[in-house]
């Protein structure tokens, strides 16, 4: 479960970075 959480967190960070927020 920890791995999924980390992956989700990285995905969110990448998405936020793509938007430039």
UniProtKB/Swiss-Prot annotation:
Listed under GO cellular component are: T=13 icosahedral viral capsid
Q: What does this protein's UniProt record list under function? A: Capsid protein that self-associates to form 11 pentons, building the T=13 laevo capsid in association with 160 hexamers of gp23* and one dodecamer of gp20.
Modifications after synthesis and translation:
Proteolytic cleavage give rise to gp24*.
Q: What is this protein called?
A: Capsid vertex protein gp24
Answer yes or no on keyword Cytoplasm: no
* Region (Disordered), start-end ranges: 1-21
Q: Which UniProt keywords apply?
A: Capsid protein, Late protein, T=13 icosahedral capsid protein, Virion
Q: How does it assemble?
A: Homopentamer. A total of 55 subunits of gp24 forms the 11 pentamers. Interacts with portal protein gp20. Interacts with gp23 that forms 160 hexamers.
Q: Family, per the entry? A: Belongs to the T4 phage capsid protein family.
Q: Where is the composition biased (Polar residues)?
A: 10-21
> Per the UniProt entry, what species is this protein from, by scientific name?
Enterobacteria phage T6 (Bacteriophage T6)
């Amino acid at each position: 479960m920890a791995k999924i959480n980390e992956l989700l967190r990285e995905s969110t960070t990448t998405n936020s970075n793509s938007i430039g927020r």
